[in-house]
Amino acid sequence: MNFRYQPNQQPYQPPQHNNNSNNRGIPTNYQQYPPQNYQQYPPQQYYQAPINPQQFYPGPPQQPNFVSQQTGPIPQQPPGFNNQSPIPQQQPQQPQQPQPSQPSPIPQQPLSPQSSSPSSPQHVVIQPNQPNQQQQNANRKQSALKPSVQHNTIPNIPRTHSAPPSLEEQQQQHQHQNNIKGFTPEKRTPIQHSPQYVIPPQQFGKPIYPNPQQMYFQQQPPYPYYGQPPVVPVVNQMIPQTTVKKTLEIIDPKTNEKVIITSPPKSSTNSTVLPTSNTSSSSSSPTNANGSSTPSGSGYVTSFSSGNVNLRKNKQSGETTPIKQDAASTTTSTPATPSSKAESTTEAETTSKPSTPTTVDSVSSTTTPDKSNVVTAAATTTAAATTTTTTTDTTTTTTTPEAETSTTTPATEVQSPVETTKEEQPKEEVKPTEVQPPVEPTKEEPIKEEPTNEEPTKEEPAKVEPIKEEPSVVESTTTDTKEEPIIVAEEKKQEETPVTPVTEKKEEPIVKPETPVTDSTAASTTVEKESTDSTTTATVSTTAAATTTNGKVEEELEEWEKKGEEDFNIVQSSDSSTSITPATSLVFRNSGEKIVYSKELMMSLKPKSMEEPTGPLKDLKNQIETNTNQNQLNRSGNKIGGNQQNKNMGMGGMNMNPNYPPQMNMKYPPQMNMKYPPKNYNNQVQGQQQQQQGNPNFNKYAPGYQYQQQIQQGMPPPTLQPNPYQPQQATYGITFSRDPVQPSISSQPVNEKRWVPTKVNALDDSQKVLRKANFILNKITPEKFDVLTEELLELGIVDDEKVHKGTIDLIFDKALNESKFCTMYTNLCKKIFEFEKVKKEIAKRAVFEKIGVIETENYHKMSNKQRDEFDQEHNVKAVFRTLLLSTCQKEYEKIPFETVDKVPEDLKPEEKTDFEEGQFKERKRIFGLIKFIGELFKQQMLSEKIVHGIMVSLIGELQRPSEIKLECFCKLLSIVGKTLSQNEQASKYLTSYFQRMQQLVDNSQTLSQRIRFLIQNVMDLKNSNWTLKVDESAKTLKEVEATQNKQEDNRKSNPTGVKNTSNVKNMFNASFNFGGPNVKPMMAPPMNYNKNAPGIKPPAQFQPKPYPYNNNYNNQQQQQQHFGGGNNMMNNNNNNYNRGPMGNMNNNMNNNMNNNNMNNMNSNNSTSNNSANSEIQKKWDAVSTSITDSINEFLELKDEEEFMECVKSYVPSTDLYPHVISQLISTACSKQKDEPLIKKLIFASVFDKKLFTTAQFKSGYELFISSLPDLFEDRPSAFKSVASVFYSFVLNQEGLITITQFANAFTKVLDDCGSSIPKILFEFILQFEDPKKAAQLFVDNKVGVQGFFTEKDFSKITQTAISYNKDLQPFFDIVKL
């Protein structure tokens, strides 16, 4: 009947196989359990959850069909099958626990070869064979098959680890299996697989939990001629899944007889993978059309086995029947010819069946060669032992003694009876010479075995697997009765080996031995690598079933460990025991793709505690403690006993066990366990030592395999306690029988951002030159400028264009980041420019000599553009300046003037701090660029036109300009202003600049206070002839030392001239001293001299001593003589106060000894004067605010009497009157509009009201002059007001001060005020209607103007004055310098 899937119907239901002959009436709601095998660890694979979990097919069907599961398109349902029936749930108890399952190894019914097309392997048509119905019924009665679908079976306990179950569980399973008969489905009409099943409907999603049957066995469509419709329909997966092993029965199409197959021998080889190409399909060759093959596009390899079937048959028949196979477990390997794929190579097919000991006379083996390299039917593993990633080491090897007959054809070459091992032959195919072609071609006929009187053995179909050609396989054929195994390491290959048809073979029934077999007999007949104990007839079925199950567990564990060690091939180790004579021991390696396990399932199955395992692992630990014995093997493949430590001890007493020492709580992933073994560890030597010690399983790299064998075979308990860390080792532990190769460093992932040390040898010439240039620029200073510049030019930085540009970038970046040395870097650019210009001129001359005189004359007649082209063509053009200016232009265009001052409002406090820091760095770089451009203009490397363009763009905005632009404009103008002012054409631009600046200053609402002061400073700088108060440029050490020495000399010669604004008492002290710190002696004599104020006397503590007073006064007289002149009043005072024992000293100022004595006496009185000044300062601080308010009130009310009354009431002592006078003068200079009122108030207070004496007035204006540095710092243009106020004091009728006093007072603060003092002189002269009158005043009083200038300006006083104002020229024409 045809099964057709209807995509529009309800979710897919399993096909119900109509068994007309034997319908067992199993209910529809029967829940099929997976095969009872607890030794396999479930591969960790999750499936996508379906749209509706209820729609996913929960499990196997109700009927006990034993058809192997398949992968590929979903088979169709037979007509009449109810698709609307409810779907039973699968394992509702624990839906999230993956359950191990394995395909049932029940023979499938052969199909007609005409039922499928070679060109469409995906649409498999399975046809039943009705004549074979009776044989199936007979087989059911003869053999007891595994009741994998019986609804009364014991519930399958889900296992989450690879440990074996308990003995009680196994006994229950085996009893149940022995009591239930197997069932083989009836043959039926072919199943039409249509292309619609390639993409299933949406309702067939993936389960929300992993399906055990789909996890373990990748579902594939049946083979073209031997397939059966699957009992459990597998939802077509939308994504590729991992390969899963499956089992199919092979039926000979010619005789319709099952080819009996046996399990392969346990392979001690390394892990070899036999990948198969996706192109191996039934349509690839005619040969595949006649044999079973994997459908194209599946990409999976399937192994077949029927070992469990034979065991069940043996148990039903009550006889021990080890399935015999070809004498040498023949494997033939020949490379496939490119012309025809009909003759292809089938690799890694080994034959061996676990069986009980048999009699010698009843065993025979045959080997049949095939023209097309036929793989014998007995070359497969058991259903669970066939994995796609690791080899199986669980089956037993059938051996024959000398009396055993062996039949081979003469065409087969006999291999040498020597065990050989080939290690690591990458990508080396098996040569065709390994199997000689038959001399006499034999017809491909099945060799049937003669049946005996015993019940005939049911034939099993041989399983053929399309094998990937990845590792090479060794062929082993036998012609002698005594055979040695031939083992060759397998390496990966890339070619495809198509599947060839299988020959028929009949086996002779084996007579059951009456007596139990002894150890010696077992050694000569059956070798079990898991145990060397003798077995009896009573335990034959249990041992065989356990051995078959063990293969599953070992294969599962190999999959488990293969994940962590996919890059390493485990070296095959030979298994040679003195008491064992194996007849055959061939390499067998299942092929396929590795299974990828999800991290979630791995973590869920791992025990929570390494000391106390929980769940099934705890049961496993209890079983180990009670069921192990001395001969038991641990998970590392070593015996557990008193001498276990000695067995693991290597040379030098070192424990060479890979799992020693146990790592407590070290949860490493599988990739890190034993990935890098001990340095001197030789796996082969260690393997031989273990082999000599009687451990045939030393090469078992599956940790759970030994426990499984020991528990099932009932070994006595061991003497040692199990390792508490074994559960973790069972999960993650990986034991190798060879030294894994450490991967090369180049294969490791590389971080692109890692730091890599620079290798000088790897640099080219230009990079080396740039490195040297950078070293020089890091060391360059103004002091070493000339030397290092020469070294830089000698590197040839102008020869190579790359080096040329790189050097410019280095200089440019340093100039912007180190603005203090900007002048030095511009000088360096000038040097390089001149050097390049000279070098190019020399090269140009050489070019002219080559081209001749005529061409040279033509060159001079060319235009500038043509000359540039000529120079560029002959590489004689200087390009340094062009590249430098281009770099400046690019950097200037990058300045974000609009956003550099803006701070986003939505920033957090910490983000705002970082943003402001970034703004500060950006502003610093902008100002460095502006300064660099200005310095380049001063070096004449930048044209004036470019500078004007920049300045216009910065200040030319009509509306409120950006403050950052105005700041850049002020900095640039302060640098280039002096150079521009010397050009008459630029004076027009400067005039317009200052007019715009004045407009900005006057409009206080548009700009902040800081920017307005900054603009005012530039305007004052222009008025001061562009002379900076502080030179911020870099200086040499000599220049710094000279400046410091000069300042020190000034402090020593004129201590009152030192600016000290932190303490006003020092200013007050300095205002009264001309030669020493004594103050009050200047006040006392005038007070005594003033007859109009007899009541005012100085306090007692201010009474002067004779020596300091005379010294101070004499110093004053000397200064007056220096400027030439003085008034009569001071001359009269000279006679009155030049008295005492030391009076003669005043007439001789050249006596150094006397000067030193006077200085010492002055220093003795400094302490008392400082204490007095401190008290005065405290008093003034208390009343200064009241005085300031009184002055402001006077300016509003203009009431002199009121002001005077306030002063008398607020100021408790006359000692504070000089501070009041200083405050009045400071107010007059600050408020030019109120200057006449302040001057009128001062005159009235001194002369009319007599509030202040003349001496107090002198002390007051001297105190004001000492504060001029602070005034000029705040108001650079205050010199005009100062000159105007003092002009009134000097030229008034009463004569408050003389011209000499005026000159002496301002000379003291020359060093602190800088260029402001000459400006005060110039403005003072300009106050006269005629400068000539001012000159006459200076000449009459013998006052010179040199005291207003520094020494370096003596030579250019007249030039400075005329540049300030041309009206000053008549004055300097009269006054002789």
Curated annotation (Swiss-Prot):
Q: Region Disordered: what ranges? A: 1-189, 259-563, 683-702, 1041-1063
Q: Which SUPFAM superfamilies would you find in this protein's record?
A: ARM repeat
The Gene Ontology CC terms held by the record are:
cytoplasm; eukaryotic translation initiation factor 4F complex
Which GO biological process annotations does it have? regulation of translational initiation; translational initiation
Q: Where is this chain compositionally biased, Basic and acidic residues type?
A: 420-432, 441-471, 480-496, 1041-1052
**Regions of compositional bias (Low complexity) in chain numbering:** 1-57, 84-94, 111-137, 168-179, 267-296, 326-412, 533-549
Say which family it is in: Belongs to the eukaryotic initiation factor 4G family.
* UniProt key word Protein biosynthesis: yes
Q: Where is the composition biased (Polar residues)?
A: 297-323, 517-526, 1053-1063
Function as written in the Swiss-Prot or TrEMBL entry: Probable component of the protein complex eIF4F, which is involved in the recognition of the mRNA cap, ATP-dependent unwinding of 5'-terminal secondary structure and recruitment of mRNA to the ribosome.
Q: Write down the Gene3D superfamilies for this protein, in alphabetical order.
A: 1.25.40.180
> InterPro entries from the xrefs?
ARM-type_fold, Initiation_fac_eIF4g_MI, MIF4G-like_typ-3
Its recorded name reads Eukaryotic translation initiation factor 4 gamma
- Regions crossing the membrane: none
- From which lineage does this chain's organism come? Eukaryota, Amoebozoa, Evosea, Eumycetozoa, Dictyostelia
Top-level taxonomic group: Eukaryota
> Is Ribonucleoprotein included in the keywords of this UniProt record?
no
